[in-house]
Amino acid sequence: GISETVCDPSGVEQLEVLTVDEPTISMTFQVNDSPFAGVKDRSGGKFLTSRQLRDRLTRETQHNVALKVEDTDDADKFKVSGRGELHLSILIETMRREGYELAVSRPEVIIKEIDGQMMEPIESLVVDLEEQYQGGVMARLGERKALLQNMEPDGKGRVRLDFMIPARGLIGFQTEFRTITAGTGLLFHVFDHYGPKADGAIGQRQNGVLISNGTGPSPAYAQIAMQERGRLFLDPGEEIYEGQIVGIHAKDNDLTVNALRGKQL
């Protein structure tokens, strides 16, 4: 087991006990209940049931010691907690490649009440980037409640910035960071401590989504008409279902669209 010491009986001396970081992020894993669940051409999933999902998650906790799995009021849903987005995303991708089909909720930070005060996980964040992108990154991190601790230019056009930031401020930020820095920035973060929960929402998406109003194949004609509304996720003729997110809206509100409209001949 973790932190157990194997030694000669004549000289028993236990090594220092390892401390396993507590989970800071949780997600709900559940049985895939979409209309395409189990459809081979869509997912290729082999393991679809809650029992199979439970067994796989239970096996994972035997060697992934920082992972925590809990039952919920719904037999088809499990609360899975880990050390961050990357920790859980690796598990999800591994399960997908193994043939497990599942749905997941958006990640949420684990809030604790300590001495009557609501506390949230605070991360130590280090970014290394070209000076020309410094302003944009600092502005976005400021919106996510990050506090600058230190700044060190290297004299060669790059700068290192140290921040303290709520863990929820990092959710979804890595993709945004790569976009701002044109892929040249480096980002590292690690859990530091629990601190007072910051007021207000953090890291809300800037754009709404495009939602299909029906089920069936989405023709190219309909997609051409939708392109002026935002960026699509679809290929011409792709099968979709009612309620499916088919793109990112150019504005900040969600919009239901007709993704099935064909050309009148």
Say what each PLM segment does.
Residues 1-265:
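Accessory interaction regions appended to the cores of large information-processing enzymes
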